[in-house]
Design a protein with these regions (language model features):
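Conserved ABC ATPase "signature" region
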Residues: 98, 102, 109-127
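Conserved ABC transporter NBD signature motif
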Residues: 55-69, 73-74
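ABC ATPase "signature
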Residues: 214-215
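Catalytic Walker B motif of ABC-type/P-loop ATPase nucleotide-binding domains
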Residues: 156-160
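Walker A (P-loop) phosphate-binding loop of ABC-type ATPase nucleotide-binding domains
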Residues: 35-39
Length: 249
């Protein structure tokens, strides 16, 4: 199970949002780190096939096959949690996931079991019959992760999954990704250093659409040239005046 990006490029008009991006993802948890405008969202939208590469702008391969040719079979392997998604306040958590299961074409009987399973994974089983309008921000975040898990995807893309969570809920997400990362490819986008260094097996630092460097936390901090060897100082080293975008560092 591999996701390979080769020389990927994406322009928005004259803006080069992703520049010659090449990387191979295998089973594990990967953190995409960088300030606003680094290219994280563009990269995720290309991987989820919500955006198309430039003409002659590289290729994205899933298990050796171009995703543009795989179509529905690729999307069936994919779970995506967007940073923002409409939640229906008058629906219960269970009904909301049932609605999304139907849209994904999951048979009703199978969906019932899956919904119970994903709610348990994000520790929302006791709130299954509660209306979403009464959920806290952290509960809504976990519900969005639950919907991404429907269909048991092999590739999971999470956009800012820990944004606005309290420490207890961050632990829930960390434990979940630790377990799922043993059998899935998980990409997590964030600009919060303190979160990603405890969640990710490998971290990719992006700036203005370019992959600056990547590695484990221990590998990355060895690149720090001045001061204490921390991921925060590496961030400052690479981003300088942009570093104030790394809230929570």
């Amino acid at each position: 199970m591999t996701l390979v990006l080769r020389h990927c490029n994406k322009h928005y008009g004259k803006k080069h949002a992703l520049k010659d991006f090449t990387f191979s993802f295998e089973t594990g948890v990967y953190g995409l780190l960088g300030p606003n405008g680094a290219g994280k969202s563009t990269l995720m939208n290309l991987i989820t096939d919500n955006l198309k590469l430039d003409k002659d702008g590289g290729e994205i391969l899933w298990d050796g096959q171009p995703i543009r040719k795989l179509g529905k079979s690729y999307r069936a392997c994919l779970g995506f949690m967007p940073q923002q998604q409409e939640l229906y306040a008058n629906m219960t958590a269970r009904d909301f996931l049932g609605y999304l299961s139907a849209l994904k074409g999951i048979p009703r009987k199978e969906a019932k079991d899956q919904i119970a399973d994903v709610l348990e994974q994000v520790e929302l089983s006791e709130q299954a019959a509660q209306k979403i309008g009464g959920f806290s921000g952290g509960m809504k975040q976990r519900l969005l992760i639950a919907q991404a898990l429907l269909g048991n995807p092999s590739l999971l893309i999470l956009d800012e999954p820990t944004a606005g969570l309290d420490p207890k809920q961050r632990v829930i997400i960390r434990n979940l990704t630790d377990r799922l990362g043993q059998e899935k490819i998980i990409l997590i986008s964030t600009h919060i250093i303190s979160d990603i260094e405890t969640i990710a097996d490998q971290i990719l630092l992006l700036r203005k659409g370019t992959l600056l460097t990547h590695g484990t936390v221990s590998e990355l901090i060895e690149q720090v040239q001045t001061g204490e060897k921390t991921l925060e100082n590496l961030y400052l080293q690479y981003y300088g005046g942009e570093a104030n975008a790394a809230g929570g560092a």
